[in-house]
């Protein structure tokens, strides 16, 4: 329907806020502690300007690239996010949207849909895991991903279980039983469209994480898996090297902000790193990802693929990141708002917005390809870049 279309990611967010129960929407905007980092992720892009060319724009712009061996139509991938139960089709709808727009998807190990179902919707799936449960349990999940056909592995390490969110932590129930439904009903009843979408399926939102269990099993409840994760000692660099060797294929380390950590990741044999602060959901006060990107890209960009996630809201943000050294970006909240606003079509809408913005920025800069972008296309304030580590 025409009135389902939205022009910007900001409008998608507004619609998500209107259509989701309050506690569900809060899970899409939550960030750690004061929210300094999540705010800086977005604001930092506004500090960067462009140095446009007025003559010489090509008739068509090439946005295609590759990430970990996968051809994608533009330098934008779907970032792994947990429990996408804001829509009945969840990760399957997102996978279909990514496939329709020619890009790859990171699938969270805390997803609400099985890896087998998601890969059936889009073969370009990078399976994401946390260091959870020790080597034997992790090896089982890696083998399941391999058997399902995942084309790469993403390991997320930047998590400190921050507490004390100033606006309150998301209220995710342990299970969706009658008691929970009754407790949430005052919120849900004033969001009839959201309620109707799930009502048609005769299934409440799924709060289990099937990819944490064996294939064919329902998997643990979200909070059971979360509790096990909190109780698992964090990995060492030897663990990362072991996991990379166990997988034996394209391997991304997500959550790198420091130059010295980037160098250690290269030594561990990774294929790619993502400069990321977990969308501001990690250690509050960490700089925006885009501030850390130039130093990391300069240090290791000729040895591994460097990506970025955090704060991407428009295509011009993507262009700024690529010009400063990113091969591509991963988006998270932006597509979740699209999913909440209009399901698969809403995610496609978000990807179209980003693609249109990339094309417009390339045209204004006088470039025919994203591969022509350089740092001198960007106006960078003197105190913008943060070099963390050596």
Curated annotation (Swiss-Prot):
Domain FMN hydroxy acid dehydrogenase: 1-383
SUPFAM superfamilies: FMN-linked oxidoreductases
Active site positions, chain numbering: 278
Pfam families reported for this sequence: FMN_dh
GO molecular function: FMN binding; oxidoreductase activity
Group of enzyme by EC: oxidoreductase
Top-level lineage group: Bacteria
Protein name: Pre-mycofactocin synthase
């Amino acid at each position: 329907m025409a009135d389902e279309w939205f022009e910007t990611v900001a409008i998608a967010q507004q619609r998500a806020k209107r259509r989701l129960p309050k506690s569900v929407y809060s899970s899409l905007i939550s960030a750690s502690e004061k929210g300094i980092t999540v705010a800086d992720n977005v604001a930092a892009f506004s500090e960067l300007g462009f140095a446009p060319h007025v003559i010489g724009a090509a008739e068509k712009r090439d946005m295609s690239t590759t990430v970990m061996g996968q051809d994608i139509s533009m330098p934008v991938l779907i970032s792994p996010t947990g429990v996408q139960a804001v829509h009945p089709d969840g990760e399957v709808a997102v996978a279909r949207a990514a496939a329709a727009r020619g890009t790859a998807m990171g699938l969270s190990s805390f997803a609400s849909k099985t890896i087998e179902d998601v890969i059936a919707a889009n073969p370009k799936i990078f399976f994401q895991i946390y260091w959870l449960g020790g080597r034997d349990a992790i090896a089982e999940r890696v083998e399941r991903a391999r058997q399902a056909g995942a084309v790469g592995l993403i390991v997320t390490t930047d998590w400190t279980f921050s507490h004390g969110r100033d606006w309150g932590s998301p209220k995710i129930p342990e299970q969706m039983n009658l008691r929970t439904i009754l407790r949430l009903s005052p919120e849900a009843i004033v969001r009839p469209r959201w309620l109707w979408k799930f009502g048609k399926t005769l299934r409440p939102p799924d709060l289990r994480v099937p990819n944490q269990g064996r294939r064919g099993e329902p998997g643990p409840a979200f909070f059971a898996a979360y509790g096990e994760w909190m109780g698992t000692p964090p990995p060492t660099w030897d663990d990362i090297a072991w996991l990379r060797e166990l997988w034996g294929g394209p391997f991304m380390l997500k959550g790198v902000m420091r130059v010295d950590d980037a160098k250690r990741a290269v030594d561990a044999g990774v294929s790619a790193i993502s400069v990321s602060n977990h969308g501001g959901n990690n250690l509050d006060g960490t700089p925006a990802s885009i501030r850390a990107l130039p130093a990391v890209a300069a240090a290791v960009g000729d040895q591994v693929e460097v990506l970025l996630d955090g704060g991407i809201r428009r295509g011009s943000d993507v262009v700024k990141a690529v010009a400063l050294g990113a091969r591509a970006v991963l988006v998270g909240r932006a597509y979740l708002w699209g999913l909440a606003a209009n399901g698969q079509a809403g995610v496609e809408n978000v990807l179209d917005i980003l693609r249109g913005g990339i094309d417009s920025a390339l045209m204004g800069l006088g470039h025919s390809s994203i591969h022509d972008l350089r740092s001198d296309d960007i106006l960078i304030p003197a105190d913008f870049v943060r070099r963390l580590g050596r």
